[in-house]
Amino acid sequence: MSQLKYILDIEGTVCPISFVKDTLYPFFLKQVESLVKTNDPTLQNLLAQFPVPQDASSLHEHIESLVNNDIKDSVLKQLQGYIWEQGYKSGEIKAPVYPDAIDFIQRHAPNVYIYSSGSVKAQILLFQHVEGDIDLTKSIAGYFDINTSGKKTEPQSYTNILKSIGVPPSSASDVVFISDNDKELDAALDVGISTILALRPGNNPVSNAEKYKALNNFSSI
């Protein structure tokens, strides 16, 4: 049998699902007022992609609405990545990755990949700044997001990832996707990828959880 490759979701899988909504989102929202008044050309170009009037008030309202409704918007994700970078670099943000997930990622390097709706930039920052001054990026082979691969609930996204990591469709079952979201697992299953449901404290209940192989700790793999 071929060496297994693992694709990991982030929140609710390798770190608490509360990290994004209780730490990252509030940190970002505190910066929105200054963000919409920025003179940085890169940020201005991103803001210009929002389908609203470009005055500060309209932009502020639109961004807050996207965040509060947890809309997976690619422009928003890029802006968040920029703001979170400042927080990680200043030490204000540290990622609470589960110890068993840290051990798993290190043990299975270089066969671990990350797939999240957050931007690749934000993913790298998270794994560079893990609590305990741990940098996991050297153990992770690659990162995928909605810009590089597509939405996590669409089978085509997983076909795209298989191609990116050099796995032919006939060997898809040698890839294991671990997530707390059953819709994402179903999309991966549709293209033959093996799946595991992550059952972490605080995760949203999955009505048909018995349908999936499941774990509450990576040490069980």
From Swiss-Prot:
Q: Which residues bind substrate?
A: S116, S117, K152
| Principal subcellular localization | cytoplasm
Q: Name one GO cellular component term.
A: cytoplasm
Query: What InterPro entries does the database record attribute to this sequence?
Result: Enolase-ppase_E1, ENOPH1_eukaryotes, HAD-like_sf, HAD-SF_hydro_IA, HAD_sf
What chemistry does it catalyse, as a reaction equation?
5-methylsulfanyl-2,3-dioxopentyl phosphate + H2O = 1,2-dihydroxy-5-(methylsulfanyl)pent-1-en-3-one + phosphate
UniProt EC number: 3.1.3.77
**Does this entry carry the keyword NADP?**
no
Q: Where in the cell is it found?
A: Cytoplasm; Nucleus
Q: Which cofactor does it need?
A: Mg(2+)
Q: Quick one: a GO biological-process term for this protein?
A: L-methionine salvage from methylthioadenosine
Annotated metabolic or biological route of this protein = Amino-acid biosynthesis; L-methionine biosynthesis via salvage pathway; L-methionine from S-methyl-5-thio-alpha-D-ribose 1-phosphate: step 3/6; Amino-acid biosynthesis; L-methionine biosynthesis via salvage pathway; L-methionine from S-methyl-5-thio-alpha-D-ribose 1-phosphate: step 4/6
Q: Spell out the molecular function terms from Gene Ontology.
A: acireductone synthase activity; magnesium ion binding
Ordered alphabetically, the record's keywords are: Amino-acid biosynthesis, Cytoplasm, Hydrolase, Magnesium, Metal-binding, Methionine biosynthesis, Nucleus
Give the matching Pfam families.
Answer: Hydrolase (PF00702)
**Cofactor: how and how many bound:** Binds 1 Mg(2+) ion per subunit.
Which positions are annotated as binding Mg(2+)? D9, E11, D180
Record bears the keyword Transmembrane: no
Q: How does it assemble?
A: Monomer.
Family annotation (PANTHER family)? ENOLASE-PHOSPHATASE E1
Annotated NCBIfam families = enolase-ppase, HAD-SF-IA-v1
Record-stated family? Belongs to the HAD-like hydrolase superfamily. MasA/MtnC family.
Role of this protein: Bifunctional enzyme that catalyzes the enolization of 2,3-diketo-5-methylthiopentyl-1-phosphate (DK-MTP-1-P) into the intermediate 2-hydroxy-3-keto-5-methylthiopentenyl-1-phosphate (HK-MTPenyl-1-P), which is then dephosphorylated to form the acireductone 1,2-dihydroxy-3-keto-5-methylthiopentene (DHK-MTPene).
What protein name does the entry list? Enolase-phosphatase E1
Organism per entry = Kluyveromyces lactis (strain ATCC 8585 / CBS 2359 / DSM 70799 / NBRC 1267 / NRRL Y-1140 / WM37)
